[in-house]
């Protein structure tokens, strides 16, 4: 019986969506490697991060099948993360950029899976769709703790808050091995698909036989759902053919193209091209006037001005009410604070103000105090930005996603529970100046050493009252055989003790104690 050879048939598609100006997603699909990265950081930073990580993984597609798949994936991911760190060092303006990553390395009947962030991997097997990755997000922690249901997480306002990503800082991705079977279909997707499209609708699209048509349909569904974010998908079938595809597919930022679908280049045009045609209500154009319009009277002009003033005032009041009901966590004067309003300014006026400040007790118990409050709990100190680990510090500096006051307090508690640096150790106690250190064992057991504090040396010759040159230590007088000569005072040499490790640096690997 001939041995069954399993290979991949795959398709990849990417679209910048209907809201974003550029595509920060990058995707690679090849005979052995399927990889998807969703960049973040704004402007060009996100697409730079996703390109660096995909470039670091691409060589795995050329390797011979076999060996330790997870070790290969782990090494490639660390190389990509190091590339991000090096890029940030060369261009400090890119600080805070990062990317998610979900990738599969295929080798016959087994595959390795690496995951970090909120992109997703799905498996369709025997008609059942299963999510094979776990979101590294704030709302997923709420689901794990039983505070919200998975259905509530799907529409939670903080669902985009990522807790782990590749940002150039040390991080451990999730690595798993899986069995591959003929007939399996795998889907890798960015949150541009999983946020606006339900799992049930994704399942329907994945049941389309051809992988290219299935991928195209998934992009359409995301755009019909509003296309709020870049959307990228990889659809791959495990088949038992003698040969599979060999030409790799690049899409998204790494390919230099924002879109792969042949859609109009405007958001409205692309939206109308994929949406169902709606009935157009025809309007009869007004007939042209056959007489000259009279000039507006002063009373009518005054009425219009008054109406515009009322509308503008109402708009300002409504806008002010909306702004005052919005809260987010950000850095204010070096402290992790809950801000009220929205980020930015209008006509030189700030649209936000500090509302609550985080306060930590020596046992890391979090409380909130009002901004400007003269006193809080006696044993608490303000939660500083430098108390956080570097990845969360960068997110807070940029401002976490806004929502209600309860949402912001929940984010603050999550930071205090999981994102603080360890406390710096207390400084070692030292002897007060002027007080001699306690004698060593060798000094206390020397029988004939004088204990006078005025004597600089324990030897008799060094304390001779005459003004002659002190005797050489090796030529001690034979009259005192019970006291062997000592060439120097008996002290412990600093070179004999091991050097202590460098102390932890506050704000880098520890936080200052309260």
From Swiss-Prot:
**Which residues does the entry place in the Extracellular compartment?**
324-514
Query: Which top EC class is given?
Result: hydrolase
Q: Which GO terms describe its molecular function?
A: metal ion binding; protein serine/threonine phosphatase activity
Quickly give the catalysed reaction. Answer: O-phospho-L-seryl-[protein] + H2O = L-seryl-[protein] + phosphate; O-phospho-L-threonyl-[protein] + H2O = L-threonyl-[protein] + phosphate
Q: Which cofactor does it need?
A: Mn(2+)
Task: Please indicate the ranges of residues that lie on the Cytoplasmic side.
Answer: 1-302
List, for all copies, the residue spans of the domain called PPM-type phosphatase: 9-238
* Residues bound to Mn(2+) 3: 118, 160, 191
> Where do the segments described as Disordered lie?
420-514
Indicate the transmembrane segments per the record: 303-323
Single GO cellular component annotation? plasma membrane
Write out the entry's keywords from A to Z. Answer: Cell membrane, Hydrolase, Manganese, Membrane, Metal-binding, Protein phosphatase, Transmembrane, Transmembrane helix
EC number, as in UniProt: 3.1.3.16
Read off the InterPro entries from this record: PPM-type-like_dom_sf (IPR036457), PPM-type_phosphatase-like_dom (IPR001932)
- Under which name does UniProt file this protein? Serine/threonine protein phosphatase PstP
The lineage is: Bacteria, Bacillati, Actinomycetota, Actinomycetes, Mycobacteriales
